[in-house]
Amino acid sequence: MSLILIRSVVRKLVFFTAAMIIFPVFTFFVVQYLSDNALVSGGIAALAANVVLIGYVVAAFTEDTAALEKKEQ
């Protein structure tokens, strides 16, 4: 397996891991600040986590591994 491919995968994984931790928590507290309803804050934070997850799935499926392997050679 290519070192370029491994770096790309690890970089993408680290980005989405950080986004999965930071984005929902940030969203929860921002919505909590704007509205006193904890249920709404939790629901929107869950929605934010799903947005990050869908983004990761889309990024993983659109990753062009054939071009990266060809670029290596």
UniProtKB/Swiss-Prot annotation:
UniProt-listed InterPro entries: Vma21 (IPR019013)
Location of the protein in the cell: Endoplasmic reticulum membrane; Endoplasmic reticulum-Golgi intermediate compartment membrane; Cytoplasmic vesicle, COPII-coated vesicle membrane
GO biological process: vacuolar proton-transporting V-type ATPase complex assembly
Membrane topology: Multi-pass membrane protein
Sequence motif: Prevents secretion from ER, positions: 70-73
Transmembrane helix among keywords: yes
Chain segments annotated as coiled-coil in the UniProt record: none
Stretches assigned to the Cytoplasmic side: 1-12, 59-73
Residue spans crossing the bilayer: 13-33, 38-58
Keywords carried by this UniProt record: Cytoplasmic vesicle, Endoplasmic reticulum, Membrane, Transmembrane, Transmembrane helix
Gene Ontology cellular-component annotations: endoplasmic reticulum membrane; endoplasmic reticulum-Golgi intermediate compartment membrane; ER to Golgi transport vesicle membrane
Lumenal side of membrane: 34-37
Primary location: endoplasmic reticulum
Protein family: Belongs to the VMA21 family.
Function, in words: Required for the assembly of the V0 complex of the vacuolar ATPase (V-ATPase) in the endoplasmic reticulum.
Record's protein name: Vacuolar ATPase assembly integral membrane protein VMA21
Organism: Meyerozyma guilliermondii (strain ATCC 6260 / CBS 566 / DSM 6381 / JCM 1539 / NBRC 10279 / NRRL Y-324)
